[in-house]
Amino acid sequence: MTGCLTWIHFGDLHVDEADGYEGLSRFRALIASAEAHLGSAVDFALLPGDNANHSTDDQYARIADAMKGLSLPWHVLAGDHDFEPSDLTAMRAITAKMAPYAETIAGYRCLFLDIVSAGKGGPDFRIDPDQRAWIERELSTAAVAGEPVAVFMHAYPGDLRDDPDGIAGLFAAHRVAFVDTGHTHYNELLNDGRVIYGATRSTGQIEEGAPGFSIVTLDDGVPSWRFQAVNDPWPLVQITSPADRRLITDPARADNVPGSAFTVRAKVFGAADTVSLHVDDGQAIPMKRVDGVPSLWSASVDGIADGLHHLVVRCDGSEDRIDILVRNAGPRPKRNPPIALGRDVNAIGAWLERGIDGAQRGPNKNGLDW
């Protein structure tokens, strides 16, 4: 078992004096909430790009000051707005590391990509040949080392202007566990049959719902994703294994499509004394803390029949729900040939419990001048 990797994703900030620094004030409120409740349960924080709306020194200085409020390591990507002056010099005020680079975190190889510097500005997203070769080397090295991979980039591969299918094909061939992105301005999950992609609602320039952040966990390579709005109650419960039916990428894996006996794991962010599992709204099954993994709880079940089942984990008035597919002796689901890898045609649609309404309300889809 690889273990758990968890990060918090603050959506595109778009910090700008033109709106009275609305994105910045929201960012500060979200940081305060995260600092109060997440603690050691999270490995790092991500900014996915479009941090400063016009890439000015003053905008970055204000962002850097706000970032001091969170005692987690930061990883910061560039978006098209950060590249507005045709370079990323000013962005160095908020990060000492400029993508592309890779780190191994909690047993996972994490690749942080630059998709703006090779372009001409705006949404001219590109990956130059040197970075492409580097990505291939990193993926191959991780495979040899037995390290599952997470990738972080400003936009989906389908938004690249050069070889989007080739990049997404690399991710699929190497079984990347999760690709985390910004750019959309809305919450979304894609499942292209090989890789799960996520995008998180922007912090500034929101067209849907309240500001918030997403929490992503990879549990032995199984991805789970939850959105926490700024005024949502705590604790936050996140079932991390097995996979929800919407996020199945490999039906042959027992943590994607389990048999009659399996273990359920969940993370609880915030104070937790008693955590319970319920199968198909049945009686409470006590969960126990997992030694050595902060905030992770587990319980085992047996005798579950074939078919669709509902899992609920509850803690202090909060809960998480997923649907799972169980197969025992019967044939396992087939995995169809992939179509349109890394493109939002593979969006899973609305998942209201996750803060995903499926409407794709954002300027990049609807032509607004942001």
Protein language model regions, located:
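Active-site glycine-centered loops adjacent to acidic/histidine catalytic or metal-binding residues
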Residues: 12, 49-50, 79-80, 154, ...
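Serine/threonine-biased, Pro/acidic-interspersed low-complexity stretches characteristic
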Residues: 220-224, 316-370
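Binuclear metal-dependent phosphoesterase catalytic core
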Residues: 195-281, 296-328, 332-335
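N-terminal active-site segment of His-dependent metallophosphoesterases
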Residues: 1-62, 352-370
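Extended active-site neighborhood of metal-dependent phosphoesterases/phosphodiesterases
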Residues: 56-145, 163-178, 184, 188-226
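Short acidic, glycine-rich surface-loop motifs adjacent to enzyme active sites
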Residues: 48, 139-159
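Solvent-exposed serine/threonine-rich low-complexity stretches and specific carbohydrate-binding patches
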Residues: 282-292
